Amino acid sequence: MYPTRRLLQSTRLTLFTRINCSLCDTAKYTVKNLREKRPFLYSEIDVMVPQNKTWKDIYEFDVPVLHVQRVMFKSSDGRETLSDPKKLFHRFTEQEVENTIKEVEE
């Protein structure tokens, strides 16, 4: 039996967020609900943390921002090569996230 293409592909979602952001809390809840229905890799980046200055310069006034990317390659040391991100900004529904994931997986 061979794994299906879908099982071989991983999708990574990265949520750019900050504390005291109600839109960010809603976005986290949306992603959490979707994660219960389908597998994907997920991480959060707080743009206000000093080591994330690059992301702060880009997204400080735009959070929440969700990057949806396909993992193209994963090396033996765990580094990932990712597709260009599809981005969702501010307010997005579970259905919009799922549609974006499907688009990235194609």
Regions found by a protein language model. Give the residues of each.
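Thiol-based oxidoreductase modules, predominantly thioredoxin-like and allied folds used
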Residues: P39-K53
